[in-house]
């Protein structure tokens, strides 16, 4: 299994579309649903192969936009089959031979995938960052990520210092839209929109993404980044790639997927 996977190509070559598809697959396997995505659900026929508890599963479905549920997808013509995984037959994983239908598939709402009956528990399997960023919402998402992944306050301090040595601390206030910003020149309370103009765009994007990198390495979920150079300086990109390649750091075998225009990153 590769711990870093790069997608490189000229503009309009399909890099973002591929990462969108990857995010789609991870969302189905992690949440059993598709919701609030930036891409259209209509006209998609999807076939997924995944491994779980000694078996290879083949899942196929048609996807469409829900007529009743806002920003959700519906699943139809779903089929789920399985076969025992043998290392000696690794080259035949994607062969249709030996697959048998999964038994005891119940009825679920149309917006829920039947892979639920195999995986059963929702969990973060991957986090996707598109090339646009989250704007003023970035800071709230960052603090929620710190809480969700149980990362210590010292993590934020180190990440802040990594991107801007003038920032001593950043604290989210109870309304989740105002922040106490401590700089080397003093403290002040600012809104998320004001903070967006105070900090550089690279710092804003980098804060949330780097916190997620740390969580990914800690828990082993994968990270998908579209146009990684839009988030980080080239040197920092190289450092992140090395973190995922270093087995002493990436002990849970997380994988970094990214698209880039940096040809030299492939050296």
Please name every model-derived segment.
Residues 165-194:
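Alpha/beta-hydrolase fold catalytic core
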Residues 1-33, 187-267:
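Switch/communication elements of ASCE P-loop NTPase nucleotide-binding domains
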Residues 48-54, 79-84, 183-189:
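Short acidic, glycine-rich loop/turn motifs
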Residues 40-42, 152, 205, 236:
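Short, glycine/acidic-rich beta->alpha junctions
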Residues 2-6, 19-67:
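Conserved P-loop NTP-binding catalytic core
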